[in-house]
Amino acid sequence: MQRQNTQAAGMPMMPQVPMVGNGVPYVVPIQPVFAPLPPDYRSLYKKLYGQGAFLVDNPVEASSPYDFSQPILKFGKLPIKQVLRDNESQQKDRKNLPRNQKSNEIQEKQTFQTPSSEKSTTERESRPFVPPNSQQMRRMLFIGNIPKELDDFWMDKILRLSGKLASWRRVADADNSMTSFGFAEFESNEQFSRALEALNDFVVPPLYEGGPSTRLSLITDVENEGLYREWQTSRYARNKQKEINILQQIRFNLERICQDIGNFDVRSRIERAARQAREKNEKLLQNVKTSEIPINAADLEGINPELLPVIEEEIRSFRDQSAMKKREKQRSKDEYASLYKEYTRKEQEKLRKQNDDLQNLLSKHRISRIPMSTVNAFLRAEDSIPESFSDEQAYYEEKRRKDQLEAEEYYARERRWMNREKARTAALEREAAREEEERVNNTSFGTYLSEKLASFDDDEEARVSRDEYFVDRAAWIRHRAVARAREEDADALDRKEEERELRTRGEGATVETENYVENGKLVTSEMPQHENGPFKIKIQTKKPAVPSERREFGLPERLLLEEEDEEPQGYSPNPQKPKPAMEENDAEKTKRLRSLIEKIPVEAESLWALPIDWSKVTEDLLKEEMQAFVTKKIIEYIGIQEDSLITFTIDHIRQHKGAEQLVSELDLALAEDAPEFVSKVYRYLHVLLILRSEA
């Protein structure tokens, strides 16, 4: 259904604005009407600015000597001609006055003011008409068909919701009653075009029950058509979604205003509050104390006396605007304080409600001494699942959250592990750097002592007395005693270390045995072999009182030969040891051990299937031999000393488990290196068992 625009009273006939049905969406742009203003529109400006306004057809020229844009001072109401006439006589008389009389006269002159009891007139009555410039005319919109019963407060609010309004002037008739049309000026071309788009189909609801609704008529100058087209092509085309959202918000606000206007009680209450606020502002403006600046006749030279009332009124308007801005600022502060108070009150109510819910939950389930974090997490978990979810959906949602929590915990553990490994690697690097620095320092100090002792001259040192021995013999003796005690302690430690090495002979043998375990080949010894070497006969009448607990081996490993190319023979875990009448020499013993070690299979499957005499795998062998070897190999494979893997491997051998099972257990940690690592460990175990059995 389309509504026709009703013609405003007292206005000339104008082309009708095309209507759009109510079913059209807001986002569809509506073609506005561009029509010329009435020929006699200038005569309407008198009604805008009062009966005393005058229309200036010719604007102020640019070459005018007066600059009205500068700050204007308020002048007192002096009789200009009388002041000019009396000024010359006063200057002549002042020459003959005493000094004190001159100062009194100056003081009286400074206190001269115009009476402030004059009643200020309103802007509509006294402010003269200022013709709009071309830019203002391009942003001006004629609005007609306004209901006369509608207060001007609502029109101002509607226009401000449509765009940034610069001014709104509603025409009044001779009886000072509002007419059905007015002029609205907007701040920018964009705001003007947006308001024209939003208000083109705006309908004022009925102001009383059973009354008709009225559609506003919008008329603007024909020249504004190019402005509107430019806005559509530039702003509306490039930022279409943004403009659509803005227009939707404007229309939504206008709908809310229409609801307030259509409700008589709400409209009356708002109009009454606005009228009271306006009367209060006018009363405050009347009570504002104006400070006037005294002037003399010289200040009035070059100013048209007829413009003094206009200048005074401009100053008054400036002061009124300043006072109004202060009141607006104070009102904004009060509103912010009230909003903040309301916000804090709501937050306190929310916390109080959460506390009540928590107390109800504790009393319902009889839960006591539960951490607040646990209860809050439970409440959040319950609130986060919508009530519309079915049991299956709630189950899958809880499962998804549980999986997400487990993933987060896994990543956290991985992060901690990475940080721990980085710290451990940095510590190892620092330790290696420290050892290298100590080695360099010791080497340098030894070189220094060697050079000093080589060129030391007792006679020369006694003569120059640079050494402590010649400077202070008693101090040198004390220091030497301390140094000697330190050296004796170090020598004792070195002797213990040498005894331990002699007992085990393990340093060189372990290296060569590990090379064989890794490469599957024996290492050639540099010690010469004699085909007809000497032999030693040892006659023993009885067994030693205390047999050695473990074999001291090392010589056979140093004499191992390279593995031959032929296939190794079968290996028995319990080889028969020959019992010659005379003790074997080192060469024969090494040859026999080499033949036994060569029989150990190299392939992984054959090596893993080889039986092990677990009765000879003692705790001493595991701790002193196997643990050191496993530790070294773990560091070679993963770069760090992982104690958990070392302990797991040793425990696996201690429990007499096979190699295949160890490979499956270490697959996650070592991946493709697990079979090679296990083969080296078990090959080394077989070598140790052979050496132990021959001890």
From Swiss-Prot:
The cross-references to InterPro entries, in alphabetical order and at most eight, read: Nucleotide-bd_a/b_plait_sf, PWI_dom, RBD_domain_sf, RBM25, RBM25_RRM, RRM_dom
Record-level Gene Ontology MF annotations: mRNA binding
UniProtKB keywords: Coiled coil, Cytoplasm, mRNA processing, mRNA splicing, Nucleus, Ribonucleoprotein, RNA-binding, Spliceosome
UniProt feature, compositional bias: Basic and acidic residues: 85-96, 487-506, 548-561
Q: Region (Disordered): which ranges? A: 85-134, 487-509, 540-590
Cell compartments where the protein resides:
Cytoplasm; Nucleus
The record's annotation in PROSITE patterns points to:
PWI, RRM
**GO terms (BP aspect):** mRNA 5'-splice site recognition
Comp. bias (Polar residues): 98-113
An example GO CC term for this entry is: cytosol
Q: What is its main location?
A: cytoplasm
Q: Which residues form a coiled coil?
A: 265-369
Q: Which residues form the PWI domain?
A: 605-695
> What domain of life?
Eukaryota
Could you tell me which residue ranges the RRM domain spans? 139-221
Function description: Component of the U1 snRNP particle, which recognizes and binds the 5'-splice site of pre-mRNA. Together with other non-snRNP factors, U1 snRNP forms the spliceosomal commitment complex, that targets pre-mRNA to the splicing pathway.
Per UniProt, subunit arrangement is: Component of the U1 snRNP particle, a subcomplex of the spliceosome. Interacts with prp5 and usp102.
State the name under which the record lists this protein. U1 snRNP-associated protein usp107
